From Swiss-Prot:
Pfam annotation, one family: YqaJ
Gene3D superfamilies assigned: 3.90.320.10
UniProt source species: Bacillus subtilis (strain 168)
Protein name: Uncharacterized protein YqaJ
InterPro entries: Lambda-type_endonuclease, NF-kappa-B_Signaling_Reg, PDDEXK-like_dom_sf, Restrct_endonuc-II-like, YqaJ_viral_recombinase
Phylogenetic placement of the source organism: Bacteria, Bacillati, Bacillota, Bacilli, Bacillales
Taxonomic superkingdom: Bacteria
PANTHER family: EXONUCLEASE, PHAGE-TYPE/RECB, C-TERMINAL DOMAIN-CONTAINING PROTEIN, EXONUCLEASE, PHAGE-TYPE_RECB, C-TERMINAL DOMAIN-CONTAINING PROTEIN-RELATED
Length: 319
């Protein structure tokens, strides 16, 4: 374990939003740690690899939840001060580990007079159980332990301030866990050296990013080319067909239940039971009748039609 202090990579106040996004791509931050460990619900290691290797554009876009989370950060931090009696200050910089310059930290707040940090969160009321009693989501525990690891061994504690559903506030604290920090950094070092610098892609997953990657990389085909698949693909194909069959059966069961509920609703647009609401409302949809357009206005159809190319995947049993 190093006793050196974290270094300032860049000051947030001296960077534009675009520059800040580019700097984040140059290393592994706290929110990346849970992705690498497979604990993140929203992003996979493969998607992170695409981002860190520059294979997807640096994205400025953020979800509405993330937008309001950023907007409310000051309010959450001030409420923490009121409830805890502690004082906090901003650390307006991207920090980096003194030995591993690709391990970065962008800490929300530092605790004044204490070797500790504050992480501010906003979350939906649906996630209330994740914060009940002593509970803290694993991905956030990993995030702050990553930060404590970057800051150095003298930083012994992290606090969370959380606004839940816009009307419930909780704050919690956790101690530094050196064993967990070592495990996190080991995984991050391996990911950066082997995957990012070494160009070795993580295992493909079911994300839309992985699908787009394959579409772009293998957009062109060799006409009628056929290959012998490796032995491992026999089991993959069998599992694929089984899952597709299960999906079809489940969709049929779901449709049956849906029809039974609709039958009871009759001409009502809404139905209520307990804390559930069923909705069956009329929807107006305007679409172009392409067949009619082609028949009656062939010249216009030729001008506006768009030809697309894609590869269709399918599996069938052959003799």
């Amino acid at each position: 374990m190093t006793s050196k202090r974290a270094e300032v990579l860049a000051k947030n106040s001296e960077m534009s939003r675009d520059e800040w996004l580019i700097e984040r791509r140059k290393g592994i931050g706290g929110s990346d740690a849970s992705i690498i460990l497979g604990l993140n619900k929203w992003k996979t290691p493969f998607e992170l690899w695409l981002d860190k290797t520059g294979q997807v554009p640096v994205s400025e876009s953020q979800s509405e939840a993330a937008y309001f989370g950023s907007l409310l950060e000051d309010i959450v931090a001030k409420e923490f001060e009121i409830r805890s009696g502690k004082k906090v200050r901003r650390k307006k910089a991207i920090l980096r580990h003194p030995e591993y310059n690709f391990i970065l930290a962008n800490v929300d707040r530092m605790i004044v007079g204490e070797k500790a940090i504050l992480e501010c969160k906003t979350t939906s009321a649906y996630n209330l159980k994740e914060w009940e009693d002593e509970e803290i989501p694993e991905s956030y525990i990993v995030q702050v332990q990553h930060y404590l690891g970057v800051l150095g061994p003298e930083y012994r504690k992290a606090y969370f301030a959380v606004l839940i559903g816009g009307n419930k506030f909780v704050w919690k604290e956790i101690e530094r866990d050196d064993e967990l920090i070592d495990m996190i950094f080991k995984a991050e070092i391996e990911f950066w050296n082997d995957k990012v610098l070494g160009g070795q892609a993580p295992a493909l997953d079911g994300s839309s990013a992985a699908e787009e990657y394959l579409k772009k990389r293998y957009a062109e085909t060799e006409n009628n080319k056929a290959i012998d698949l490796t032995a491992a693909n026999r089991e993959r194909i069998q599992q694929y067909l089984l899952i597709k069959e299960q999906i079809s059966e489940l969709q049929s069961q779901a449709k049956e239940l849906e029809n039974q509920i609709k039958h009871e609703m009759k001409d009502a647009e809404y139905g209520f039971i307990g804390n559930y609401q069923a909705c069956w409302k009329p929807v107006v949809s305007n679409r172009i009748d392409t067949k009619k357009l082609k028949d009656q206005f062939p010249d216009v159809y030729e001008k506006v039609k768009k030809e697309t190319h894609f590869r269709r995947f399918g599996i069938k049993e052959v003799s």
